[in-house]
Curated annotation (Swiss-Prot):
ATP binds at residues 81, 83, 196, 296, 300, 302, 319. The lineage of its organism: Eukaryota, Metazoa, Chordata, Craniata, Vertebrata. InterPro entries: P2X2_purnocptor, P2X_extracellular_dom_sf, P2X_purnocptor, P2X_RECEPTOR_CS. Glycans are attached at residues 133, 194, 310. Residues 1-42, 359-471 are cytoplasmic. Belongs to the P2X receptor family. One of its GO terms (biological process) is peristalsis. GO terms for molecular function: ATP binding; extracellularly ATP-gated monoatomic cation channel activity; identical protein binding; ligand-gated monoatomic ion channel activity; purinergic nucleotide receptor activity. This is P2X purinoceptor 2. PROSITE patterns: P2X_RECEPTOR. It comes from Homo sapiens (Human). It catalyses: Ca(2+)(in) = Ca(2+)(out); K(+)(in) = K(+)(out); Na(+)(in) = Na(+)(out).
Length: 471
């Protein structure tokens, strides 16, 4: 029967573990070069290195331009101006009426359809049938003094006939008649596709002290006769409204009836290592509001025009549907800088070592002679002091370049340890200074290992416990 393993107290085990961790903290590791002559492993190693180099050269340096210092989000100013006239069923509309607000900022609306409720005055009238709990059968259904936040006025407590039809609604005091009862629709979209929009944009990158605008520096009246064309008139930022809607992939008639939000996106991506003439704006157009969501699609707003008739304040309430234009500017500028170049070069050179790590893992895990490779790859050198306290032990003796001291036998003169004791002796260092072995080859830091691909793994003989005879 096998002898029972000794059981250590829990405290002793913890102390041994702590001492082992403390001792391992002060170990020093130095790389050891082993040349393994294996074609498949060598091809894999060079292939991994090539892939890493291609990634850094093509993607990191050419595509991402990581050798440059960059700045995003330029300082920007936008001035807009709309021109054109249109007609509806009842009148002619000019810019002052259909553009809101008139200041010409980065966000503005062009009205394409209106629902107007004329001659509203303060008085009593039937509530809109669309308001919740507005319908009634008798005065008992209407509570006097009740105010509905989604309604049009203060309820008087009377149930009165609606504007048209047999229905009845509660009477309210407010601006009468209410919107749904007397509104008139007018469509302005007949000539709207021909409206012209001037978008003047200037950007500045403060880090690089670089500024530029999107209008050509010409004094011959160029802007009065040009319209935008990406190839021939890039610096003529005058767009037709129909062109913007078409580029956004929308139907102008549908958009004019329901309203919507169109984004004009100006992108300034500038490589400042090139001349300033190579830094040009790029325009794109897309719809910003979710048109397929009924609850939030479309765009409309209300405003009123006030006047007096015989001393009575009167107003015209207008519910306007239109196309809102949002001008959005973004960009990025880059210029060569030594610091990011050095950082990315160092990262590239360091990443090449991934190939060595991968091949080492394959070598020590899947190759036929993995135990022999492990022995060649990892050495443990213990350098305790002599009993007399002599220190230091020279590095040449540790690496095996110096001959052993007189009176010490070499490794070949020592008897082979019994089976099962070799691993214990290799893992621990005795209290006395052990004999240092000379390096078995000429170079202390590089070893040559031949690994024929077809050679099967062989078991080590008792006279060669480490399997070195296979090398």
């Amino acid at each position: 029967m096998a002898a029972a393993q000794p059981k250590y107290p829990a405290g002793a085990t913890a102390r041994r573990l702590a001492r082992g961790c403390w001792s391992a903290l002060w170990d020093y590791e130095t790389p050891k070069v082993i040349v393994v002559r294996n074609r498949r492993l060598g091809v894999l190693y060079r292939a991994v290195q090539l892939l890493i180099l291609l990634y850094f050269v093509w993607y990191v340096f050419i595509v991402q331009k990581s050798y440059q210092e960059s700045e995003t989000g330029p300082e920007s100013s936008i001035i807009t101006k709309v021109k054109g006239i249109t007609t509806s069923e009842h009148k002619v509309w000019d810019v002052e009426e259909y553009v809101k607000p008139p200041e010409g900022g980065s966000v503005f609306s062009i009205i394409t359809r209106v629902e107007a409720t004329h001659s509203q005055t303060q008085g009593t009238c039937p509530e809109s049938i669309r308001v919740h709990n507005a319908t009634c059968l008798s005065d008992a259904d209407c509570v006097a003094g009740e105010l509905d936040m989604l309604g049009n006025g203060l309820r008087t407590g009377r149930c009165v006939p609606y504007y048209q039809g047999p229905s009845k609604t509660c009477e309210v005091f407010g601006w009468c008649p209410v919107e749904d009862g007397a509104s008139v629709s007018q469509f302005l979209g007949t000539m709207a596709p021909n409206f012209t929009i001037l978008i003047k944009n200037s950007i500045h990158y403060p880090k690089f002290h670089f500024s530029k605008g999107n209008i050509a520096d010409r004094t011959d009246g160029y802007l009065k006769r040009c319209t935008f064309h990406e190839a021939s008139d890039l610096y003529c930022p005058i767009f037709k409204l129909g062109f913007i809607v078409e580029k956004a992939g929308e139907s102008f008639t549908e958009l004019a009836h329901k309203g919507g939000v169109i984004g004009v996106i100006i992108n300034w991506d500038c490589d400042l290592d090139l001349p300033a003439s190579e830094c040009n704006p790029k325009y794109s157009f897309r719809r910003l509001d979710p048109k397929h969501v009924p609850a939030s699609s479309g765009y409309n707003f209300r405003f009123a025009k006030y006047y007096k008739i015989n001393g009575t304040t009167t107003r015209t309430l207008i519910k306007a549907y239109g196309i809102r234009i949002d001008v959005i500017v973004h960009g990025q500028a880059g210029k060569f800088s030594l610091i990011p170049t050095i950082i990315n070069l160092a990262t590239a050179l360091t990443s090449v070592g991934v190939g060595s790590f991968l091949c080492d893992w394959i070598l020590l895990t899947f190759m036929n002679k993995n135990k022999v490779y492990s022995h060649k790859k990892f050495d443990k050198v213990c350098t305790p002091s002599h009993p007399s306290g002599s220190w230091p032990v020279t590095l040449a003796r540790v690496l095996g370049q110096a001959p052993p001291e007189p009176g010490h036998r070499s490794e070949d003169q020592h008897p082979s340890p019994p089976s099962g004791q070799e691993g214990q002796q290799g893992a621990e260092c005795g209290p006395a200074f052990p004999p240092l072995r000379p390096c078995p080859i000429s170079a202390p830091s590089e070893q040559m290992v031949d690994t024929p691909a077809s050679e099967p793994a062989q078991a080590s003989t008792p006279t060669d416990p480490k399997g070195l005879a296979q090398l």
